[in-house]
Every structure is written in structure tokens, then in C-alpha cells.
């Protein structure tokens, strides 16, 4: 599992039941965020579903969690004739790219990724010495147009040739001028984040750009913040 954004895990419990003997790997942070979202915050089921359906979905999610094997980042391990290394993908807490090596193949796969460092979360990192023959990228969610994507790709390739990871300063958010304008008018600003992991981006953004502005959290947002704090963020 590359990372724990809901569009990547919402149907995973159902999919896992179709492959009952498949081994499922993830980082510790990804596994924890899956548990928080699907079980503690109830995102495994819809509001209009019957209790029987909800209970079955929870059972599937619990089974999925018990099957997830935690693997460390940047430490190669062996599995079924393959050498596997999980590499930081940026993007969110726990997100990784997967580097697979066999006798005849070298494949680098990534789910969503971020090239730049932003709001306390480092960008993707491809160490020196990794030269895949096949590169599988999930590029639509990098939020770049073709010209910008080409520029970023050139920078990553340059960093790889130099044997170093590539990171850059935090991006400016379109929220900043909107919030500043409202604060200048002595208005209160109400922000909503429907994604549990993206709450961390929002909290880092507010702390970095508006360090002297009081921030009040609703009970559910406070629970999310406490969960992230317990994870060390």
C-alpha cells in the first residue's frame, strides 16, 4: 500500500477479500492511518447503510489490518525472489515508492508523490545507485502542468546523477492571501479539511504562515491533531 489517502484505501478491504492469500505490505505510519480512518473515524461505511452492512465492512477492515505487514523505509528486504526497498515518496505521512529488483528486472513504482518539501514533510527521495529499467509513476496527482512537470523531472534526474535526494522549500498556498484579507477585516476564518492526513498539511501551513494567529480546533479536528501528535508529527 503506497500511502493512506482515502482514495487509495477506501475499497482496499473489499479488494483484499478477493485475494485472501496475498501478502500486504505498508509502512507503520500508513498502517496506523488506515486504522484511524477506516475504524476509529468510521470512513469504511456510508451513513445510509444498514447496521448489518456496516458491521460486515468493519469486519473486512479489521481482517485487512491484521494482514498488513509493516516494513521499514530505506532498508532492503527479500520476498519471493525479489529484493524490495521502500523509498520516501513525500506527498503525505508514510508514503513510499517501491523499488523491486530481480535477476533480470529493476522496477521503481510510485503511487502519488511530491517532489518538493513542504510544511514539514520531506519530498521524494531516490538515493544514488538506484537506476530502474522500468519506471511506473502515478503522475496525474502531482498537480503540475506539462511544462512544470518537465522542469521538476529534470531536477530530480540531476539530483539522482549527483547521488542526492531532491527537496525544495515549502510551496505557497492559495489560502494565504484569502486568510490575510479576512484577518485584515477582523473576520474569523473557518477552514474545513475532509481528509484526515491532509489535516497535517493544514496545521503545518497555519503554524508556518500564521504563527501568531490563534487557531481553535473542533472536537473531531482536535482528535485528529492528537492522533498525529502521538505519531510524532
Predicted regions and their residues:
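P-loop NTPase motor catalytic core
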Residues: 2
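Acidic, Ser/Thr-rich peripheral helices and adjacent loops at domain boundaries
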Residues: 46, 54-55, 225-233
Amino acid at each position: 500500500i503506497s500511502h493512506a489517502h482515502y482514495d487509495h484505501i477506501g475499497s482496499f478491504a473489499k479488494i483484499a477479500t478477493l485475494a485472501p492469500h496475498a501478502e500486504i505490505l505498508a509502512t507503520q505510519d500508513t498502517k496506523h492511518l488506515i486504522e484511524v480512518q477506516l475504524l476509529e473515524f468510521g470512513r469504511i461505511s456510508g451513513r445510509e447503510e444498514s447496521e448489518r452492512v456496516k458491521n460486515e465492512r468493519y469486519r473486512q477492515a479489521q481482517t485487512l489490518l491484521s494482514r498488513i505487514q509493516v516494513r521499514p523505509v530505506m532498508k532492503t528486504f527479500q520476498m519471493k525472489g525479489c529484493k524490495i526497498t521502500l523509498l520516501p515518496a513525500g506527498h503525505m505521512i508514510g508514503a513510499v515508492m517501491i523499488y523491486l529488483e530481480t535477476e533480470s528486472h529493476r522496477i521503481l513504482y510510485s503511487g502519488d508523490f511530491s517532489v518538493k518539501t513542504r510544511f514539514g514533510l520531506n519530498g521524494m527521495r531516490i538515493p544514488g545507485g538506484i537506476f530502474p529499467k522500468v519506471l511506473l509513476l502515478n503522475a496525474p496527482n502531482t498537480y503540475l502542468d506539462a511544462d512544470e512537470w518537465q522542469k521538476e523531472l529534470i531536477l530530480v534526474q540531476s539530483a539522482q546523477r549527483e547521488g542526492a535526494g531532491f527537496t525544495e522549500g515549502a510551496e505557497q498556498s492559495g489560502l494565504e492571501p484569502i486568510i490575510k484579507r479576512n484577518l485584515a477585516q477582523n473576520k474569523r476564518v473557518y477552514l474545513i479539511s475532509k481528509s484526515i492526513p491532509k489535516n497535517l498539511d493544514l496545521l503545518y501551513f497555519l503554524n508556518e504562515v500564521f504563527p501568531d494567529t490563534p487557531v481553535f480546533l473542533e472536537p473531531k479536528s482536535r482528535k485528529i491533531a492528537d492522533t498525529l501528535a502521538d505519531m510524532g508529527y
